[in-house]
Regions:
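N-terminal acidic leader/helix
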Residues: 2-33
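An amphipathic alpha-helix signature
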Residues: 15, 19, 35-46
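Short, exposed beta-strand "edge-strand" segments with a Pro/Gly-rich flavor and a Y/T-containing core
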Residues: 19, 33-35, 58-64
């Protein structure tokens, strides 16, 4: 996997966003939406009027690093 962005020390920003939402018990839209890339679920926001992009993530995103997700959640819960 190639990591495109670094957010708060986490190379993979999709993993960081999923972990952050789960660690903070945030309500997440489209969590089961089958997306193939980062922009797929951004385009699907049109179906949810008024929903911010940051509230929309997908566990199907190809950039999601499942192996580091648990570690990221634990670290974010300690913040």
């Amino acid at each position: 996997m190639t990591n495109k962005n670094e957010v708060n020390g986490w190379i993979n920003r999709v993993t960081y966003r999923v972990a952050s939402a789960l660690a903070n018990d945030e309500f997440v839209y489209n969590i089961a939406l089958k997306s193939t890339d980062f922009n797929d679920y951004r385009r699907n926001l049109r179906a949810f009027a008024g929903i911010d992009e940051l509230d929309t993530i997908s566990l199907w995103n190809k950039d999601l690093d499942i192996d580091s997700l648990t570690e990221a959640i634990k670290e974010l819960k300690n913040d």
